[in-house]
Amino acid sequence: MNSFRRGMVLASLALAGGLASAQAFPERELSGVIMWGAGGATDVVARAVAPMAEEALGKKIVLQNRSGGSGAISTNFVNQQPSDGYTLLLGAENPQLHGVLGIGDLDYSKFYPVNILGRGIVVIVANKDKPWKSFKDLLADIQANPGKVKMGSTGPGGLPHSVGSMIGTVTKMPVTAVPFDGEGPGLTALQGGHVDFMPVGLGADSENIKAGRVKAIAVLSSQPHEGIPALTGDLPAIGKYLPWGPFYGVFVKRDVPDAVKARLTTAFKTAASNPKFVDLMVGRGNAVMNISGAEADAFLKKWQSVTAWTLQEAGVAKRSPADLGIARP
């Protein structure tokens, strides 16, 4: 056998082996990297869907929280792993803003959306001992005492930062942002009186609201939600950005083999359709989306466009969306 034929045979065997490996996926346990810390909305959603995906895949998904850098730590970590589908990124919306905020160049365009599980409802919650009964009361206090009211934050690109920036484009809101490593620690600080208010995903705080440990003074919507007043009632101008909210999804590197992507997509579609998961999501104030592939990519691009240009308008973007090729909404 000459060298050319030998090379062709070896290449064919390698390709066949790769296809067989992809079709047999998964052959061992998977790693699920959660973008934010324990107790936050992303963590809650990830830990709810993982057992159902394990059942569909027939293998364990070992979960680990790897927070930091507004999601950049986990995103970079997963991007550095082999393109075999065994490392999943269980993340939220944050990487879509890393470019405009100067955090990094890695966003979800470099990843395949296995499943956008759902999107959240945003509420503005306050320490239960504060006198505010509405967002109007909170805003009046903020404007009367510039820099004295403390807002819990998760850093640039996090949900509180994005919502605060949106509000800041339509009214003056001179607060002091106090950063935490995820919604969970921020909400703990809120209950302890270390910060005064915090915009969060309802999924992260519904139990605290129901138990009276914090009070919800507005929902980022044009319609009330379960007795929580719509923010547009006190701030009509915010309506131009609505509907808007965080989202939660499962991602792998874009160059993972197609057969592996298909296997993961099917498994998580089944998991996200499970009535127990749907009930948990809805019960925590989330809308189930359960989309993947091209449909999910279109959603991600639209969300990035709306939010990146909002940050540009608010004057907090470090880089122009136009320079990053992000089209105006």
Regions found by a protein language model. Name each.
Residues 3-9:
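N-terminal export leaders
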Residues 17-21:
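N-terminal signal peptide c-region/cleavage motif recognized by signal peptidases
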Residues 23-110, 148, 171-197, 201, ...:
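N-terminal (or domain-start) structured segment
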Residues 27-29, 210, 262-329:
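An extracytoplasmic/periplasmic, membrane-proximal ligand-sensing/linker region
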Residues 30, 39, 46, 63, ...:
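Residue-level signal for nonpolar/aromatic packing positions in well-ordered secondary structure
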Residues 53, 77-86, 99-185, 231, ...:
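Hinge/capping helix and adjacent helix->loop/strand transition within the periplasmic-binding protein
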Residues 93-95, 119, 129, 202-203, ...:
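Solvent-exposed coil/turn segments that connect beta secondary-structure elements
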Residues 205-273, 319-322, 326-329:
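C-terminal lobe and pocket-closing loops
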